[in-house]
Amino acid sequence: MSGIAYSRDHEVVQRLRPEPVTQAEADAQACIDPVEFDIFKHKMHMIALEGKETTMKLGASTAMRWGDVAFGVFTRQGDLAVCATGIYHHAVLGQIPLKYVVKHWVDEPSVGVNDGDSFFYNDPFYAGVHNADMGLSIPVFYKGELMCFVGAAVHTGEAGGTEPGGTCNTAKTKYDEGLLVPPIKIGENYQLREDILNMLAAMTRDPRTMILDIKARLAAARIAQRRILEVIEEKGPEFFIGGLRRILTQTGEAAKRRVSQLNDGIYRQPRFLDTVGTDPGLTKINLTLI
């Protein structure tokens, strides 16, 4: 058994930092040519962009159509390596759910993580801004070895809360906002499970949009999976694993350089809300960064 306590996992949500570099990743990075790596990085970005555009074009919900979407390629440990997004705060929606999947389901005999599986999640404790942000991810295997994950996160809209539309302005608890689904397997052998789809559809006011959006995420993920397997066939699994890790390393270094360019000092920014709880009223929030 995985040791899951049938409650929210407070340890996994702390793991926003990249997981430690494995020996396989370290060995692979040492052999990567810089020019070949730049080409690889560009291909990964194009794969993510194609996934995002496919999700937008196939989806049914309004938010999906106008770009409230993120599509990512994740390491096999669950870290986000490459992302294409319409709204940037969605960029990390799949990271914690996939670390949850790796932690709890890989070695769990009643679940497992296998080629052709699909995992769905929308509990904002693990990912998303609110319950209407729903994600689907699939693993990518090459010759029986897990290479990475790919997946899409989308604001579907209708989540079955106390108010239609996915944004419950009068909600007083998280349970007022509808669906709360931790990372679960909803498909095997590249087929979505009809019983789980039926359950999810029954919990919303707009079941057809819910199901069409799920299928759009899966279709985009399958396209990305195919593209990634083409890259692995061309460059080899070691190059791919090392390349994803190098993208993570470079991104971290670039972020540190950008932050280091800021002038030392105290930065203040006030923000205003027009509600106090569920009642009208002005609330001022002061943010100070030192």
Predicted regions and their residues:
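Flexible, glycine/threonine-enriched loop-and-boundary segments that flank and lead into catalytic domains
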Residues: 60, 265-289
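A short, hydrophobic, proline-anchored segment that marks a local hinge/packing element in signaling
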Residues: 133-143, 151, 288
